[in-house]
Every structure is written in C-alpha cells, then in structure tokens.
Amino acid sequence: MGTLTVNQNKLQKRLRRQAGEAVADFNMIEEGDKVMVCLSGGKDSYTMLDVLLHLQKVAPIKFEIVAVNMDQKQPGFPEHVLPAYLKELGIEYHIVEKDTYSVVKELIPEGKTTCSLCSRLRRGTLYTFADEIGATKMALGHHRDDIVETFFLNMFYNGSLKAMPPKLLADDGRNVVIRPLAYCSEKDIQAYSDLKQFPIIPCNLCGSQENLQRQVVKEMLQEWERKTPGRTESIFRGLQNVIPSQLADRNLFDFTSLRIDDSATPRFVNVVNL
C-alpha cells in the first residue's frame, strides 16, 4: 500500500485510537500477555490483527501475538491464503484443523441456520487450543455494530438485556476473551479492509443465509442509521451508561425497600402561598 490520502490516514488513526482506548478502558492486554488473535479470514479479524500489531509496537508494555485460524474443513476452503499472508507478516501462527463442517451439516437440517452451532463448536475448539499454547487472552474481531446487534437480538428473541462484553471470562474460568474493536464501527472496518486489500475468505457454510435473525436486526439498525446518523453509536453509549433504578430487574436494584424519606427537603414550590 502506497502513501495514504488525508482521509485514509484519518481512518487508520481513528481505528488505532479507538482500539487503543478500548484496550485501555477494559484493561484487555497486560504486561507479558500472550494474545491469541483468532483469524477467520474476514475483514474484522484482519483489521484486528493489523491494529494489534501496531499497538504492540507503540504500547508501553510488552506482549506476544499469536495468530490462529481454524480450518473447519468446509468445501473449497482456500488453505493457502492465511498461511501465505501470515508468513509475509512474519508472525507466529497456527492453523487448527477440526472438521466441524461435517458435524454441523449432520445435525442441522438443510435450510436452517447453522451459525449458532458452528460458533459454539469453533469457540470450544479455540478455547482448548488457547489453553494448550498458554495464551492468556483470546482476541475476537467483534466490533461496535456486532455488540449493538447482539443487544437487540437478545432483547427481541430472548427477553434479556445482554450484549457482547468487550472483555469476558469464559465459563471454564481458563480463558479471557477480549474484543479490541469494541469501539470501532463496521463501516470504518470495511473501508479499512478495502484500503488494505486483505485476502478475504468467504464463509461457504453460512455466508449465504440471508434469513438469519441477525441480518434482520442489522438491516433495522442500518435503516435507523440512514434516517438518524449516529444512532448506533448512541445506543452503544447507552450500554455503557446503565441505570438499574430506571429498569425493572429486581436483582439489580432493591425496589422493595423504597420508602418516602420524611426528612427530605421538598422539591416543589408551594404556588398557593406565592
């Protein structure tokens, strides 16, 4: 890639700054960490790796980066693409081979959504591998739009106010998941991916499933964004500014103990005696 234009330079700086802020705000990476960067071959994970490699150079702490891709034995998967790219970068990498494709195709009826099972199988394999190589953090490429979409998916279909946290301790207690792109927009990531011309690998298993619930939510948010630019960012800020007393979860706030405070000073003016 040659010299960047002014706008391209701003884009790169913005992504690096936002990722750096997310890493700092949630203490995602610490001195001596071994960060396993999970690469799918998509725009998000390529951008995450690119940004983390820059952060590794400029951060005041020392940490390792190990790139890991999982070959799920999907038909037509271009096995050579990621190794060639990572060799050119000169970083440590591993290709984990696990035939989850056959498992998914066997268990999920034709035409049904495969994403949930595929994701669980992939995540479990990666958790195990992170433990094997002694990785202290596992970096995933989810961005701000993913987090907001997940929030609405859980609210609409599961009846829960839950999203994707920027940092998460896995249920097994042995893996800490981080999402360095949590503050970054998908629009910026797509533009950066186009700029860098990353060798994108499409998902042949689920990439064509347009009837996904997530796709419906994504289109809803995109329509909102067209009508009111900045709405997705505002919703994300809301996830960082939760006020339990203004919700209805009795586990988060003790509503039963609310009583009138007779010693409190009245806030209202007695207009009758004015």
Curated annotation (Swiss-Prot):
Binding residue positions for [4Fe-4S] cluster: 115, 118, 206
GO MF annotations in UniProt: 4 iron, 4 sulfur cluster binding; ATP binding; magnesium ion binding; sulfurtransferase activity; tRNA binding
Cofactor note: Binds 1 [4Fe-4S] cluster per subunit. The cluster is chelated by three Cys residues, the fourth Fe has a free coordination site that may bind a sulfur atom transferred from the persulfide of IscS.
E.C. no: 2.8.1.-
GO cellular component: cytoplasm
Pathway(s) of this molecule: tRNA modification
Chief localisation class: cytoplasm
Cofactors (names): Mg(2+); [4Fe-4S] cluster
GO terms under biological process: tRNA thio-modification
UniProt-listed CDD domains: TtcA-like (cd24138)
Enzyme class: transferase
Superkingdom: Bacteria
Subunit and interaction comment: Homodimer.
Family: Belongs to the TtcA family.
Function: Catalyzes the ATP-dependent 2-thiolation of cytidine in position 32 of tRNA, to form 2-thiocytidine (s(2)C32). The sulfur atoms are provided by the cysteine/cysteine desulfurase (IscS) system.
PANTHER family: AMINOTRAN_5 DOMAIN-CONTAINING PROTEIN, SULFURTRANSFERASE-RELATED
Protein name, as recorded: tRNA-cytidine(32) 2-sulfurtransferase
